[in-house]
Regions:
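ATP-binding N-terminal substructure of ATP-dependent carboxylate-amine bond-forming enzymes
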Residues: 1-79, 83, 95-103
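Glycine-rich phosphate/pyrophosphate-binding beta-alpha loops
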Residues: 41, 124, 179-182
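Active-site nucleotide/adenylate-binding loops and adjacent lid/helix of ATP-dependent enzymes
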Residues: 15-18, 30, 70-159
């Protein structure tokens, strides 16, 4: 949020940066033109904030509350993409209370390496890249700490890119180059070696 705040200020906009942990939504000044949500994870990316802002009649930028809720749940997102005929990595959602044998059997069916993650979480929280069967139990337990459903997918090495789209206008592709193996929480928020 700080980078967006600074960029908007440099372009002459008056910006009030709000931490929802310190200021309730109903305390937002009535003179506010628009909210640009920059929150991650539960409450920020899952449609909750968007629904609350709609309820209060406060205009905001971003995807609808419904779209945010659907895409925050990675298992639901996989189902939507598959039904649309789009290619997705081999994988499956599972209840972390499944038997160890069931988890290992399903995991072996897609091969290694794998990405094990909470089905509904943001910012790469709770994600582990698993290179062998001996690490699957620990990875599932870590993901389950963050959500009641776990997603296991085949790890596909490649370039990480993001493509901003605003009001139907497609902006240039941005490649993300983390210093570590993948774009984890640290690379996103703490490691100044990440390049864009």
């Amino acid at each position: 949020g700080a980078c967006v705040t600074n960029a908007l200020r440099q372009r002459g906009h008056r910006v009030l940066q709000i931490d929802p942990a310190l200021l309730a939504l109903h305390e937002i000044p009535h003179s506010t033109d628009v909210i640009y949500p920059m929150l991650h994870g539960t409450g920020g990316e899952d449609g909750t904030l968007q629904r609350d802002l709609d309820r209060l009649g406060i205009p905001w930028l971003g995807s609808s509350a419904e779209a945010s809720a659907l895409t925050f749940d990675k298992v639901v997102t996989r189902e939507i993409l598959a039904k649309a005929g789009l290619p997705i990595a081999p994988g499956f959602g599972l209840n972390p209370d499944s038997t160890r044998e069931a988890i290992h059997t399903a995991s072996l069916s897609i091969g290694y390496p794998q990405v094990v993650k909470p089905a509904a979480q943001g910012s790469s929280v709770g994600i582990t890249i698993v290179d062998s069967e001996q690490d699957i139990d620990t990875a599932v337990a870590e993901a389950a700490r963050w959500d009641g459903m776990v997603l296991i997918e085949k790890y596909i090495a490649g370039r990480e890119v993001t493509v901003p789209v605003v009001n139907g206008e497609v902006f240039p592709v941005v490649e993300i180059l983390p210093a570590a193996r993948w774009y984890d929480y640290s690379a996103k928020y703490a490691d100044d070696r990440t390049q864009y």
